[in-house]
Regions:
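Beta-strand-rich domain onsets/edges
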Residues: 1-20, 28
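Short hydrophobic alpha-helix segments
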Residues: 14, 22, 39-42, 53
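Beta-strand signatures of extracellular beta-sandwich domains
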Residues: 23-27, 63-65
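Short, acidic Ser/Thr/Gly-rich low-complexity loop/linker segments typical of extracellular
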Residues: 33-50
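A glycine-anchored, Pro-Gly-centered beta-turn/N-cap motif
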Residues: 57-62
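Feature of secretome-associated and extracellular-like proteins
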Residues: 63-113
Length: 113
């Protein structure tokens, strides 16, 4: 059974709230070591986003690009990071949940559940 799912959750630690309406793109590193774009999605009101579902998610190296520049611009906040790339090795048949803790001048990520 394919248990593979890929999701994220973005929290803006500068205001203590979820980051809604942030565009996230997903790319897969292909056999010739080039990034192949798979999907673009957007976080919901709770800052959550299902990126890939079972059957859409082969093993491999993935790049998540969080397009946070527009999120901060809408709030009239300058940011050092207009986009954040997180590269993840998704080689196991598991659910990969990659949260992003964000503020205008820094970020942190980890593997969640």
């Amino acid at each position: 059974m394919d248990a593979r799912k890929f999701s994220t959750h973005i929290l803006d630690t500068s205001v203590g709230k979820a980051a809604a309406n942030v565009r996230v793109t997903v790319s897969l590193l292909d056999e010739i070591q080039e990034w192949r774009s798979l999907r673009a999605a957007q976080t919901d009101a709770d800052g959550r986003c299902l990126l890939l579902e079972p059957g859409q998610f082969p093993s491999g190296i993935y790049k998540l690009t969080f397009h946070v520049g527009a999120y901060f611009a809408e709030r009239d906040v300058k940011t050092l990071y207009p986009a954040i790339d997180i590269i993840v090795d998704c080689s196991e048949n598991q659910h990969y949940h990659i949260p992003l803790l964000l503020n205008p001048f820094g970020y942190s990520t980890y593997r969640g559940t």
